[in-house]
A protein has these predicted regions:
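Short, solvent-exposed loop/turn elements at beta->coil junctions and helix N-caps
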Residues: 25-32
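Conserved C-terminal structural/oligomerization subdomain of aldehyde/semialdehyde dehydrogenase
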Residues: 34-154
């Protein structure tokens, strides 16, 4: 239940900071889901980069929608957070996609997709979103260490 309370807490924060709740923001009405950890997919619009909901890792079905007209301002705001686990870029233009991938400061980026993992592809964040990579050979190396041993013979 604490996970559900965390979602409710972030919805309150989003509303208090001036975000506009477009949909969701509550537990489902379905009686079969009332006792679980379910929370409706939630979308906030009219968000600003300084809002807490936009600056923290929520790890829940809560989406903040922003509007920009200047690409430099967009990436400045996107990268001006303490976290950088994942990012999703939605575009019809591959040139735009590649430019965005170079500019976004996250450890994992999807283009026209979200939340899909690929076997063997390193997964992990930058900044306060952790260190190291999971789901790849590098993950195994995280559990080892190198040791240099020198032996003088004679």
């Amino acid at each position: 239940a604490s996970d559900v309370y965390k979602r409710q807490h972030y919805v309150r924060i989003g509303l208090e900071d001036g975000g506009r709740l477009v949909c969701g923001g509550r537990r489902p009405d379905d009686p079969q889901l009332k006792d679980g950890f379910f929370y409706e997919p939630t979308v906030f619009a009219d968000m600003q980069p300084h809002m807490r909901l936009a600056r923290e890792e929520v790890f829940g079905p809560i989406l903040s929608v922003f509007k920009w007209s200047d690409e430099d301002a967009l990436f400045e705001a996107v990268n001006d957070v303490d976290f950088g686990l994942t990012g999703a870029i939605w575009t019809r233009d591959l040139v735009t996609a590649h430019r965005a991938v170079r500019r976004i400061q996250t450890g994992y980026v999807w283009i026209n997709n979200s939340s899909q993992h690929f076997m063997g592809a390193p997964f992990g964040g930058v900044k306060q979103s952790g260190i190291g990579r999971e789901e790849c050979f590098s993950e195994l190396l995280e559990f080892t260490y190198s040791k240099n041993v020198n032996l003088k013979l004679g």
